[in-house]
């Protein structure tokens, strides 16, 4: 399960998902080409997180897409998710690797080469590098641009996904000039028409991969 | 480590712990007779919870007192705590037991005999039964009285600690009439003079144990 297709990595955010449950939204995204799903929940109880994760796991299992849980190693273990993604406010990458063992996927966030190298050294399987662009929903995030993402990609030997304000209008440029292995998106996928967002983004990513000769 | 002395089980609450850090407060409580420590944190990041838990674990390890983490199985694994306590909003007892295996302590909350039997069946090592009394800090908690706690104690074959509004003024009555194995307290220990609270409560509990012939 460690060999992952990072082309289009969707991160859930219930604030964008209206009128349907998260599992339904995830299913639309997967049907239209999302290759990895990260379930991200804040400000809910462990029991609620667990129950949502169980439902989402049913969908990802059905389509054989890896499910990554944001932050909560216990929820990942509880639903037998494929992995965990941790950022600066979460458990350190090395601690997560120790708990999960060698077979689960561990991802780390980085906005600098130094952080990315640290996460790689601690056992991360991939890096979420960003923020590429400024995001209205996350004004506190450090913006490193396509250039900052490219430096991270060049520094590490593990896959890198670009994150932060990437959508169908800029995914082509990000892939082409940063050299990353895929795009990670929240609003870019779940804000609005999930089917159209996913298809358009995937087309732009593939167009850039082709241009790069990947 | 499964053989626990549940006599006086302290649950941390930072809102009562002023002018010192949680590890210091826990050390005072342990020095004065607390036999189990539960670290309970809400509304902080996983990283902060982890860092506090590491500090508290240093103290509990020094005095050879078991450390139980409230809710977060991942934090317990990260700091190698002795166990986890889960309530109705947390992961189910059976899931926690499956993740932690047979050697860690798993505690469950119950306000009814039915819930207590369910937790026991799912693999709980002990029950936190209550609320014994109404608590201003937790107005939503179901109050079951000393009688409700006694029914739970009589129904299960695992240790029971009484929780909810128990302090030095009522611990004697609770122990004497409910037959429980110990008292669990938050405010009863950490609100005010921790040393005096702990000593007084322990004296009352022991007086009732003696009266009961335990
Ligand atoms: Ni260009």
UniProtKB/Swiss-Prot annotation, chains A, B:
Catalysed reactions, semicolon-separated: 2-[(2R,5Z)-2-carboxy-4-methylthiazol-5(2H)-ylidene]ethyl phosphate + 4-amino-2-methyl-5-(diphosphooxymethyl)pyrimidine + 2 H(+) = thiamine phosphate + CO2 + diphosphate; 2-(2-carboxy-4-methylthiazol-5-yl)ethyl phosphate + 4-amino-2-methyl-5-(diphosphooxymethyl)pyrimidine + 2 H(+) = thiamine phosphate + CO2 + diphosphate; 4-methyl-5-(2-phosphooxyethyl)-thiazole + 4-amino-2-methyl-5-(diphosphooxymethyl)pyrimidine + H(+) = thiamine phosphate + diphosphate
Binding site for 2-[(2R,5Z)-2-carboxy-4-methylthiazol-5(2H)-ylidene]ethyl phosphate: 165
Pathway(s) where this gene product acts: Cofactor biosynthesis; thiamine diphosphate biosynthesis; thiamine phosphate from 4-amino-2-methyl-5-diphosphomethylpyrimidine and 4-methyl-5-(2-phosphoethyl)-thiazole: step 1/1
Known cofactor(s): Mg(2+)
A GO CC term attached to the entry: cytoplasm
Alphabetically ordered keywords of this record: Magnesium, Metal-binding, Thiamine biosynthesis, Transferase
Top EC group: transferase
Cofactor note as given: Binds 1 Mg(2+) ion per subunit.
Pfam families assigned: TMP-TENI
Top-level taxon: Bacteria
Example GO BP: thiamine biosynthetic process
Chain positions recorded as 4-amino-2-methyl-5-(diphosphooxymethyl)pyrimidine binding sites: 38-42, 70, 109, 138
Disulfide links within the chain: none
Binding site for Mg(2+): 71, 90
One Gene Ontology MF term: thiamine-phosphate diphosphorylase activity
Record bears the keyword Iron-sulfur: no
Keyword Lyase annotated: no
Record-listed E.C. numbers: 2.5.1.3
Functional note: Condenses 4-methyl-5-(beta-hydroxyethyl)thiazole monophosphate (THZ-P) and 2-methyl-4-amino-5-hydroxymethyl pyrimidine pyrophosphate (HMP-PP) to form thiamine monophosphate (TMP).
Entry's family note: Belongs to the thiamine-phosphate synthase family.
HAMAP family, per database record: TMP_synthase
Protein name, UniProt field: Thiamine-phosphate synthase
The organism of origin for this protein: Caldanaerobacter subterraneus subsp. tengcongensis (strain DSM 15242 / JCM 11007 / NBRC 100824 / MB4)
């Amino acid at each position: 399960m460690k060999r992952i297709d990072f082309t289009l990595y969707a991160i859930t955010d219930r604030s964008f998902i209206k009128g349907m449950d998260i599992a339904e939204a995830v299913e639309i995204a997967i049907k239209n080409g999302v290759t990895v799903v990260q379930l991200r929940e804040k400000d809910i109880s462990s029991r609620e997180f667990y129950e949502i994760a169980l439902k989402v796991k049913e969908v990802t299992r059905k389509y054989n897409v890896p499910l990554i849980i944001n932050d909560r190693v216990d929820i990942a273990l509880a639903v037998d998710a494929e992995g965990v993604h941790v950022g600066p406010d979460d458990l350190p990458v090395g601690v997560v690797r120790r708990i999960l063992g060698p077979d689960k996927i561990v991802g780390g966030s980085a906005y600098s080469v130094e952080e990315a190298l640290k996460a790689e050294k601690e056992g991360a399987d991939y890096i979420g590098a960003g923020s590429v662009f400024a995001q209205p929903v996350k004004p506190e995030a450090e913006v490193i641009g396509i250039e900052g993402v490219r430096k991270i990609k060049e520094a590490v030997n593990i896959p890198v996904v670009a994150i932060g304000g990437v959508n169908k209008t800029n995914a082509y440029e990000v892939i082409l000039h940063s050299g990353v292995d895929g795009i990670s998106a929240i609003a870019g996928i779940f804000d609005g028409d999930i089917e159209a967002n996913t298809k358009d983004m995937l087309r732009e990513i593939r167009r850039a991969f082709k241009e790069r000769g990947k």
